[in-house]
Amino acid sequence: MDRDQRLIEFCQEAIRIPSPSGQEQGVAQLMKRKMEEYGFDEVVIDRYGSVLGRMRGKRPGKTILLDGHIDNVDVIDAGEWTHDPFGGEIDQGRIYGRGTSDMKGSVTAMISAVAHFAEDTGRDFAGEICVSCTVHEECFEGVSSREITRLARPDFVIIGEATSTTVKIGQRGRAEVVVETEGVSCHSSNPDKGVNAVYHMMAVIEEIRRIVPNEHPILGKGILELTDIISSPYPGASVV
């Protein structure tokens, strides 16, 4: 079997294992087994369930980490798909299935590429190449990758997210900010007896909307966006 066909079948096998966030064990075991078959020097599953494989060169040098996540967004509308979301079917040169581009295709390609590079060079390269298959990215991005970074201690990182084959040199980063306003509950017929937390939150939101995000000459303008508002416990508090 040639390398391309072997990679295609590897990707299809990964797609056929559903792996919503928190349920990545099956595909993690597949990644571990494939790395071992490909001759990675060390393959471990960390305390969060992410897989880390190491391929060492013959000479000392720096460490590069190729990273991707193996969880996928859950499927709640399978009946609306034109192909089985977990079938890994090929149609007109494309593989269809949940997680194909985000990002089982990339992860399987990176594992295969490292293995073939080691084989073609006879491992005559400096340093170490690591491949990580992280979990919980779709719902809790950053936590599992922090553990991988601690274990691999890379000098350079390449993240295999889909970019239409264009190289992206960085990203703007992300921060999630939680703002709370407190009120005093009362019956709506006697609003003067309480404090409406929602009104306080409205004032906070208006102030936030006046903030102008920073702009970077390469990364562009920053984004500041309200993503959620909750009253909990209702109606005593509002959380954004």
Language model regions located:
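N-terminal helical capping/dimerization or prosegment-like subdomains
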Residues: M1-L65, H69-V75
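A structural signal for short hydrophobic beta-strand segments in well-ordered beta-sheet cores
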Residues: V43, G53, G88-I90, L226-I229
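Active-site metal-coordination/substrate-binding segment of hydrolases
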Residues: K62-C130
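Acidic/histidine-rich catalytic neighborhood of metal-dependent amide-processing enzymes
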Residues: M103-R172, E176, Y234
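Metal-dependent peptidase/peptidase-like ectodomains
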Residues: T166-H200
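Acidic-enriched catalytic cores of C-N bond-cleaving enzymes acting on peptides and small amides
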Residues: P191-V240
